């Protein structure tokens, strides 16, 4: 992290959550709006995280779960409209292409991802949350939605595609066509949010969910995520083939052998991600 970074990556401080990392948006004075600089900082954090996963170092914990959160009272207000007003049409197109790429990188992370929503998640901010595996919001959050149609545009970084896949086409149409802003409970009822945490912060609940995943074998978690994600929008027969393609490599893993040995020896397995 540099002094000017608008997003940073850090390990969880709890010993029980070794392997849990936080990707933090840090532009609270601008409601964590996505500027070009913030976008590039997030991309850099994602590159570092992927490197930690694919090229682990012995003196660093292997990333197991990512919590995506933000500093300040707002999760993310979407694109930086002040910056957008100064952009040419070509620059807007380039920005949207970069934003779509960034969200695809979040979605493609091989480890489970949790969006910790403690404040408004609007437009591109909600699109960012939808790219995560789970969305957890504090019960005090009162603004979750897509206001784009009221600004003369549409969600342009995956919102029109991910929202229908998560909440269904009709609900997504109503949400996007009307630009309705939901509170946390309404968003959960709609299926946009998976869990609502009491109070004004959901970080503790995110950490509890992450802790529930910690006993799982890292390679198995990655394979499960890949199988579910790749098979979600294909025919069942193709999905079953994808499931097997994700399952088969685990047969040769050291973690699978460790699990069998631990079961026989009546102890907890010690997984290494190998």
From Swiss-Prot:
Residues 79-109 form a coiled coil. Pfam families: ECH_1. It comes from the Eukaryota. Signal peptide: none annotated. One of its GO terms (cellular component) is mitochondrion. GO terms for molecular function: enoyl-CoA hydratase activity; isomerase activity. Its EC number is 4.2.1.17. The record marks 148 as: Important for catalytic activity. Disruption phenotype: Impairs the production of ferrichrome A but does not affect the production of ferrichrome. Enoyl-CoA isomerase/hydratase; part of the gene cluster that mediates the biosynthesis of siderophore ferrichrome A which is contributing to organismal virulence. The first step of ferrichrome A biosynthesis is performed by the HMG-CoA synthase hcs1 which catalyzes the generation of HMG-CoA and CoA using acetoacetyl-CoA and acetyl-CoA as substrates. The enoyl-CoA isomerase/hydratase fer4 then catalyzes the conversion of hcs1-produced HMG-CoA to methylglutaconyl-CoA. This is Enoyl-CoA isomerase/hydratase fer4. It comes from Mycosarcoma maydis.
């Amino acid at each position: 992290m540099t002094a000017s970074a608008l997003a940073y990556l850090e390990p969880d401080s709890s010993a029980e959550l070794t392997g849990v990392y936080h990707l933090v948006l840090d532009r609270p004075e601008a409601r964590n709006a996505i500027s070009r600089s913030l976008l590039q900082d997030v991309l850099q954090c994602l590159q570092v995280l992927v490197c930690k996963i694919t090229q682990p170092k012995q003196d660093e914990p292997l990333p197991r779960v990512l919590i995506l959160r933000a500093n300040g009272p707002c999760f993310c207000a979407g694109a930086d409209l002040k910056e957008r007003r100064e952009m040419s049409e070509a620059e807007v197109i380039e920005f949207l292409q970069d934003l779509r790429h960034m969200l695809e990188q979040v979605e493609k992370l091989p480890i489970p991802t949790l969006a910790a929503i403690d404040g408004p998640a609007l437009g591109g901010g909600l699109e960012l949350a939808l790219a995560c595996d789970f969305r957890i919001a504090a019960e005090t959050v009162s603004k979750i939605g897509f206001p784009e149609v009221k600004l003369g545009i549409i969600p342009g970084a995956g919102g029109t595609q991910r929202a229908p896949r998560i909440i269904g086409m009709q609900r997504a149409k109503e949400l996007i066509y009307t630009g309705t802003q939901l509170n946390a409970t309404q968003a959960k009822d709609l299926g946009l949010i998976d869990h609502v945490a009491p109070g004004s912060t959901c970080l503790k609940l995110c950490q509890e969910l992450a802790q529930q995943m910690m006993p799982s074998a890292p390679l198995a978690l990655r394979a499960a995520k890949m199988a579910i994600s790749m098979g979600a929008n294909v025919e069942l027969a193709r999905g079953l083939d994808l499931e097997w393609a994700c399952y088969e490599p685990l047969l040769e893993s050291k973690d699978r052998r460790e699990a069998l040995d631990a079961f026989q020896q009546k102890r907890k397995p010690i997984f290494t991600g190998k």
